[in-house]
Amino acid sequence: MSVAVPFAPSPTGLLHVGNVRLALVNWLFARKAGGNFLVRLDDTDEERSKPEYAEGIERDLTWLGLTWDRFARESDRYGATDEVAAALKASGRLYPCYETPEELNLKRASLSSQGRPPIYDRAALRLGDADRARLEAEGRKPHWRFKLEHTPVEWTDLVRGPVHFEGSALSDPVLIAEDGRPLYTLTSVVDDADLAITHVIRGEDHLANTAVQIQIFEAVGGAVPVFAHLPLLTDATGQGLSKRLGSLSVASLREEEGIEPMALASLLAKLGTSDAIEPRLTLDELVAEFDIAKVSRATPKFDPEELLRLNARILHLLPFERVAGELAASVWMMPTPAFWEAVPNLSRVAEARDWWAVTHAPVARRRTIPLFLAEAATLLPKEPWDLSTWGTWTGAVKAKTGRKGKDLFLPLRRALTGRDHGGQLKNLLPLIGRTRAHKRLAGETA
C-alpha cells in the first residue's frame, strides 16, 4: 500500500512555525517514501473557522513549496461521518448525554478537588427512556459520547517508541456536539479510514487523543495507521506558540521579516533532530537527508535569531536568478547580477535597498575635502571598469601618496559610500561608475 499522510490544520488562525514544522515533516516523510501528502482542513469549528485563514494556509504551504496530492475539507465529508455515527449509535458505542456545560464544569471541579482526573462518570448510561424523554421535553439536546473499552491501548510510535494507555484512565470523548455537528475526533478517523491514510504524524499533545482514536478505528472497522508524535516547538524562552495571537506566524516571517522559504525549511527540518542545521537550497536536499528516526523526544526551541543567521547564509548562496524578483521589489530600478554579487552579506533581500542607494543615490557632500582625495580623483582610471579596477587604482594612489592600510582605504570608502563598513569596494566601484566616483571624491553630492 502506498504511503499516505495528512496535514490537518484548523483554519482558525494564522499558521505559526510549529504548525508548519508538522506540515514539513509530513511532506518530507511522504516524499521520502514516494507516497502522497494530503491537506485536510479541520473546519469543524464553524464559529472560528474563517475563509481568510483557509486561504492563508494554502498560501503558506505554497510559499514553502509543500505541494499536495489532494486537498479536502472535513466539512465537505459530513455525509460519510453521519453514516459512521449512525452505525456507532446502533451498536451502543455512541450514547446520548444531556449535561449542560455548567454541570460538566461542576463535575470536573469536584473531581479536581478530590485529586482525581477529569474522567466522565457515564451518568448518561444510567438514564432510562423516560429520563431522556423528560430532559428533551425540557429543551435539552443531547451530545454524544463514545463508550471506550476499559482495556489497554498500545502502539509503537515512530518517535516515542512503545506507548501504553489504560482505557479506564481515559474519558469517553464527545464525538457529536449538541447541535448535531461531528467533532474532529470522529471526523478525522472517518476521513483517515476513507482516504487510506497509512501514517499520522502530529504533535505530542495528541497522545491521549490517539489512544481514543485507535479504539474508534477498531469500532468502525478501519485500518489503524502508524502514529508518530513530535515534541511541540517552543519559542526561545520555552513558551508555547499560539497561532491565534500571530506569534511567529509564517505570514509575518515572510511579509515582515523577509525570510526566505528555504531558510525556514532548512531550520524546521532539522530542529529536534541529530542533524546539524545547515542551509539547503532545495527541498529535494531535505528529502534526501530526512529520517524520522532522527527526531528526538526533547523539546526543540525555535530561535528567530538563528533563523535570521540561516537566512543570511541562504542569501549568500542564492544565484541572482533566484532573487531577481525580490530585488526588483526592493529597489527602484531593475537590479543586475553585478549588483547582487557586489552587495555584502545580507540578512534579508530588502536590505539590498540600502546598498542600491550607496551605488545609485546621492551621497551627501562633506564639509572638508582632504587633499589626499583630490589626488586620488586624478588617478581614477578610464572606463570600462571591472573587478580589477579597485586594485589598479588603489595601487596607483598608494604609490603617489605613500598611504597604505587603513589610512589609504578608510578615507576612500567614506568618500565613495558615506560609510565606514560595507561590501567589497572592488565589487561596488564598477557600480558607482567613474563620473559619480569622481564627484564624490571631490566632495560633491552625487
From Swiss-Prot:
Enumerate the PROSITE patterns for this protein.
AA_TRNA_LIGASE_I
- Coiled-coil boundaries: none
Question: Motif location ('KMSKS' region)?
Answer: 240-244
Listed A to Z, the keywords are: Aminoacyl-tRNA synthetase, ATP-binding, Cytoplasm, Ligase, Nucleotide-binding, Protein biosynthesis
Q: Which molecular-function annotation in GO is an example for this chain?
A: zinc ion binding
Gene3D superfamilies documented for this protein: 1.10.10.350, HUPs (3.40.50.620)
Q: Which SUPFAM superfamilies match?
A: An anticodon-binding domain of class I aminoacyl-tRNA synthetases, Nucleotidylyl transferase
Q: What is its main location?
A: cytoplasm
Q: How does it assemble?
A: Monomer.
The UniProt function text for this chain reads: Catalyzes the attachment of glutamate to tRNA(Glu) in a two-step reaction: glutamate is first activated by ATP to form Glu-AMP and then transferred to the acceptor end of tRNA(Glu).
Q: Which family does it belong to?
A: Belongs to the class-I aminoacyl-tRNA synthetase family. Glutamate--tRNA ligase type 1 subfamily.
Q: Know the name of this protein? A: Glutamate--tRNA ligase
Organism of origin is Azospirillum brasilense
